[in-house]
Amino acid sequence: MGLFSKKIHHHEAGQVDKSRLPRHIAIIMDGNGRWAKQRGLPRTAGHKVGAETFRKIATYCKDLGVEYLTVYAFSTENWKRPADEVSTIMALLKQYMLEAIDSMERDQIRLRFLGDLSAISPELQALVDRTNEISSHIHGFQANVCLNYGGRDEILHAARRFARDCADGAAAPEDLTEEGFSSYLYSAGIPDPELIIRTSGEERLSGFLLWQCAYSEFYFCDTLWPDFDSRALDQAIIAYQSRDRRFGGVK
């Protein structure tokens, strides 16, 4: 069975209007450590279950008709965590990249990694390159994994790239637009998320998609990430669909 093909219990969609789904849902997957602590388990156990939750939610998003799912897997600040926890997260990433390489084409799911990938191991970088190569031949649902990612870091990285282009004569400051600047971001080519979800009861972005979230709707829930399921996602989508999105105007 493939990385994203594991079946979950599907329920009636209830009030979800499939004609008004967000194209792009982004999730801050928070609460793995607390989930483990509540059960007397090491934090690493929470990350293992949380990785499985990601696979289930990605499959459900694809089946529902969402086009893009972006998750915050590892931030630029997460290197400060205990070494064994960081090692476990990196080992999980390696495991799921290997599984993805074997199943992406069969499951028709593209996988893209966003962030400063120069800081990860050469082995993981090679696996990222391989998943990118496979994804280039797939059309359809795309799962984006933010790895060694920080919103401010992304904007600085984009600004430096633009500055280099200006110095080389390939760009001019007076010609820069929001759309043009977006092309320098890690997320270039991906539409901004309409809905951003954070689990575990925390109500902050923690540097997630700071440029892209200008008009996103935010949804915060108390559910810890390992317990987040298709019903919880439906509730978030229903809340999103109940809102009046004006984009700075009036109706």
Feature locations, PLM:
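Flexible, compositionally biased loop and terminal segments
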Residues: 1-251
